[in-house]
Curated annotation (Swiss-Prot):
Task of the protein: Auxin response factors (ARFs) are transcriptional factors that bind specifically to the DNA sequence 5'-TGTCTC-3' found in the auxin-responsive promoter elements (AuxREs).
Ranges for region Disordered: 1-22, 443-462, 497-529
Pfam family, one: B3
Tissue distribution of the protein: Expressed in roots, culms, leaves and young panicles.
Family label: Belongs to the ARF family.
Classification via SMART domains: B3 (SM01019)
Organism per entry: Oryza sativa subsp. japonica
Polar residues bias locations: 444-461, 511-523
Record protein name field: Auxin response factor 13
Major subcellular site: nucleus
GO BP of this protein: auxin-activated signaling pathway; regulation of DNA-templated transcription
Keyword terms, alphabetized: Auxin signaling pathway, DNA-binding, Nucleus, Transcription, Transcription regulation
Length: 529
């Protein structure tokens, strides 16, 4: 008689899922995120862009996205801030609920209450971020600590010791602790992290170009709690928008698009990296960008980090060269001006809500315009502040109306750009065939103020003389009208305050400070590229 087969043992139960990463504080998350990163606000209406979500993946999507699913109007229902368990990078898990595209726009959000602002300002929090050099990232080396970081983030050293040294304990975003030896030595003396630094570099797999962020929060020194975080530099190859160090899987993007198309709730993962556009964008910003009348030739600008000093922001100017009407995500193609900041611009394709059109620059101080004359400040070199009426070259007018002003409502499409929206170059502004004809007694034209290949012609009568003055070491010759006494009569020169130069004014107008050196973490909000 055959024996019945033995019962097979049931398969072992699957291992429990790993515990979710611990939540991190909002200020810590913003400090470790790329500059200009933002945290979406629960309850607001946003546009979700799957193509931007796909840029968070290390490889392209297996299938192209349907053309009907370019973006989805949604409401944010939850935002969870965490740190990656492998890399330590901050990321946000955003829960979204799709809306109909004809849903009415929400009312403007109320201003934060005074109590909320006071509570945010009262939090004791500072951080310092430094991009790693090749020496910092070398295995077996040390970390050169900027003095500002050592003085304001680390506890004070006893400079009477020889050498001054201390042990620092720092926690990371994953809850682990790290021990570093902080010493002040060398010729000239400098602050260094030695013992413990190589272990940290190897564990975090840091390379040159990544950024380390030192933070303290809570009570003042010596009871303050020290934290350390990292920012990962993106790795792009060629024209690909995919980041080789991306952490989002393509399947997550495809699943989010499927659920959004079915009007079902879904979640997305957002890593705030430099160069990756936000793909969950406030609706009001998208609506404004899509309703702007963009056209080729427009001058635009975007706020970016300086390439040589990531603690500072700069306005990067460019010219709109192409409109890709078949899509919404990165529909604008911009040719960026050559500048120090342009090296931080990784993609010439941008979104309409990431840039601003550049209108007429403001009138400079001291410039006077009347019906039949123009008087302008003396210019330095080839940089000149000019009024809008001179922005657009006009055909030579008939002889009977020479000297009249001709306005053009679309002149700003041809404004040359430079590091600041209000500064233009006379070589570009005044072509060879441009004649500016005005009464000879009403304008001062310094010979040293106009390049020789770009003349500004001012006819002189036989009775006119020449008057020279010396300003900041430059001899300036101006036409004047003689009188019976031979005295200087009608030439008008706008005076420059003593001790002021153009370089200072240009620097103040073009740059604003980015809080990567020492900040309380409250000014990270803003669009980024």
């Amino acid at each position: 008689m055959a024996r019945p087969p033995a019962a097979t043992a049931p398969p072992p139960p699957p291992p429990p899922p790993p515990p979710p990463p611990p939540p991190i504080d909002r200020l810590v998350w913003l400090a470790c995120a790329a500059p200009l990163s933002r945290i979406p606000v629960v309850g607001t209406q946003v546009s979700y862009f799957p193509e931007g979500h796909a840029e968070q993946c290390p490889a392209p999507l297996p299938d192209p996205l349907p053309s009907a699913h370019r973006f989805f109007l949604c409401t944010i229902t939850a935002v969870d801030l965490s740190a990656d368990t492998t890399t330590g990078e901050p990321y946000a898990t955003i829960s979204l609920l799709p809306l109909r595209h004809d849903a009415p726009a929400p009312a403007p959000a109320p201003a934060p209450a005074a109590a909320e602002l006071a509570e945010a300002e009262s939090q004791e929090f500072r951080y310092y971020a430094k991009q790693l050099t090749q020496s910092d990232a070398n295995n077996g080396g040390g970390f050169s600590v900027p003095r500002l970081c050592a003085d304001h983030i680390f506890p004070a050293l006893n400079l009477d010791d020889d050498p001054p040294v201390q042990s620092l304990t720092m926690g990371d975003l994953q809850g682990d602790s790290w021990e570093f030896r902080h010493i002040y030595r060398g010729t000239p003396r400098r602050h260094l992290l030695t013992t413990g630094w190589s272990k940290f570099v190897n564990a975090k797999q840091l390379v040159a170009g990544d950024t380390v962020v030192f933070m303290w929060c809570g009570a003042p020194a010596p009871e303050r709690k020290l934290l350390v975080g990292v920012r990962r530099a993106a790795r792009y190859s060629g024209e690909s928008a995919c980041n080789a160090r991306g952490r989002v899987q393509p399947q997550e993007v495809m699943e989010a698009v499927r659920l959004a198309a079915e009007q079902a709730a879904f979640r997305v993962t957002y890593y705030p990296r430099h160069g990756a556009g936000e793909f969950v964008v406030p609706r009001v910003e998208v609506d404004k960008g899509l309703t702007t009348p963009w056209r080729c030739g427009m001058q635009v600008r975007a706020q970016v980090m300086e390439a040589e000093d990531t603690r500072r922001l700069a306005w990067l100017n460019g010219t709109l060269t192409n409109l890709r009407h078949q899509q919404i995500w990165r529909t604008l193609e911009v040719e960026w001006d050559a500048s120090a900041a342009s090296s931080s611009m990784k993609n010439r394709f941008v979104n309409p809500w990431q840039v601003q059109p550049v209108d007429f620059p403001p009138l400079p101080m001291g410039l006077k315009i009347s019906n039949n004359n123009i008087s302008a400040p003396v210019c330095n070199g080839d940089s000149l502040l000019v009024p809008p009426i001179l922005m657009h070259p006009q055909p030579q007018p008939p002889a009977d109306i020479q000297g009249a002003r001709h306005n053009n409502g679309h002149a700003y499409a041809d404004i040359p750009s430079s590091s600041t929206p209000s500064m233009v170059r006379t070589q570009q502004l005044f072509p060879r065939d441009l004649q500016i004809l005005v009464p000879h007694t009403d304008i001062v034209t310094p010979q040293n103020g106009s390049p020789p290949d770009n003349p500004v012609n001012t006819p002189l009568s036989a009775s006119d003389g020449m008057k020279t003055i010396q300003l900041f070491g430059v001899t300036i010759t101006s036409p004047v009208q003689g009188d019976t006494n031979g005295a200087f009569a009608s030439a008008q020169v706008n005076q420059v305050p003593e001790g002021v130069d153009d370089e200072t004014a240009t620097e103040e107008a073009s740059d604003t400070s980015l809080p990567d050196s020492l900040t309380n973490g409250h000014n990270q909000d803003g669009a980024r590229l």
